[in-house]
Amino acid sequence: MYTSLLVRYGEISLKGNNRPYFEDKLLANMRRALAGLPPRRMRKTFGRVFVELHDDLEAVARRLQRVFGIVSMSPVATAPLELEAIKKAALAVLKDSPGSTFKVQAQRPNKRFPLTSPEVNQELGAYLLTHSQGQRVDVHHPDRVIHVEIRDEGAYIYSRIIPGPGGLPVGVTGRGLLLISGGIDSPVAGYMGMKRGLELTALHFHSFPFTSERSKEKVIDLCRVLAGYSGPLRLVVAPFTNIQKAIRQNCPQEFYVTIMRRMMFRIARAVAAKEEAPAILTGESLGQVASQTLQSMAVINKVVDLPVLRPLVAWDKSEIIEVARRIGTYDISIRPYEDCCTLFVPKHPATKPPLARVEAAEKNLAVVELVAECLENLEILTVEPEADVV
């Protein structure tokens, strides 16, 4: 019955002269998401895309629900510009939609069609009412709306509206380097970055043998979930054990976390340059832990000259957890394997670290050599999406 999927996008249509670039990127991402399914035509019109269906509606919709830039989708039945054919198609859509009340809402961009929109509403409403059992018309609070669009090439009839993730197509705003731990926050930050059009490279700091291989596998699994929204994702694993040992042996305990984060940012700056990523993303939320106070963030930021994006900076933990559950990262994040950020944490870390004292403490470290050693031993992985979303 359904011949195509009507895909709507919102913010993209406001992009003026740049709109074709955004639309082309969206279509490319849609084709990537549908790879492996039968080939199909996609037809772009203003503010929407029609995707051809081959009796595979649910599979197509499930994949496109992970494509940023899509606001919503509707399976569409088509009919020629003949009233009787439109009536029959509308009845089929009505019977396929659950509920006991309905209303018809017609649009008529094709002004050559002999009936006006109100007349189409009346004709179809009367027909549906007499050809369906147990149905009532309710123009104020119907269980479903039967939408009818009368266009030059034919009529499109639909009722079901499937939500999309919204946002911008991945890749239109550049690349960002995501600092990803095994926790709840950073994968959500990555998701939010992708929603604003960023393509991601992920950087994970691994402290073997203090953190196990299972900790690393957890991060790979988190990246696999994120890759379901973007396509294959590059994961850079940085060995961090020697740096943490040096900090523990040579620096005041109250500054462990601050100096550790500054070392991470130095390494991230170098990796970002190699990845051509002009921004760093973190999962920090203001005031959540000692390293996430304004003063700590300011001191940590001093070692990089790139923007540090913190998509979750004003979020409550409950809000972060809600999104983590929805996107499929929460159950992975709570696996009981420590990451390097939970190791060597002092009982009383400084929440307002003075920059001068932190810099003085770092003079006890061979900062350049430690960073260089880490960069020489990076492991680079390509993480594919989960099997059930490709």
From Swiss-Prot:
EC code: 2.8.1.4
Residues covered by the THUMP domain: 58-161
Annotated InterPro entries: Rossmann-like_a/b/a_fold (IPR014729), ThiI_AANH (IPR020536), ThiI_fer (IPR054173), ThiI_N (IPR049961), THUMP_dom (IPR004114), THUMP_ThiI (IPR049962), tRNA_STrfase (IPR003720), tRNA_sulfurtransferase_ThiI (IPR050102)
GO cellular component: a single term: cytosol
GO terms under biological process: thiamine biosynthetic process; thiamine diphosphate biosynthetic process; thiazole biosynthetic process; tRNA 4-thiouridine biosynthesis
Pfam families: ThiI, ThiI_fer, THUMP
Family note: Belongs to the ThiI family.
Role, per record: Catalyzes the ATP-dependent transfer of a sulfur to tRNA to produce 4-thiouridine in position 8 of tRNAs, which functions as a near-UV photosensor. Also catalyzes the transfer of sulfur to the sulfur carrier protein ThiS, forming ThiS-thiocarboxylate. This is a step in the synthesis of thiazole, in the thiamine biosynthesis pathway. The sulfur is donated as persulfide by IscS.
Name this polypeptide is given: Probable tRNA sulfurtransferase
Organism: Moorella thermoacetica (strain ATCC 39073 / JCM 9320)
Lineage per the UniProt record: Bacteria, Bacillati, Bacillota, Clostridia, Moorellales
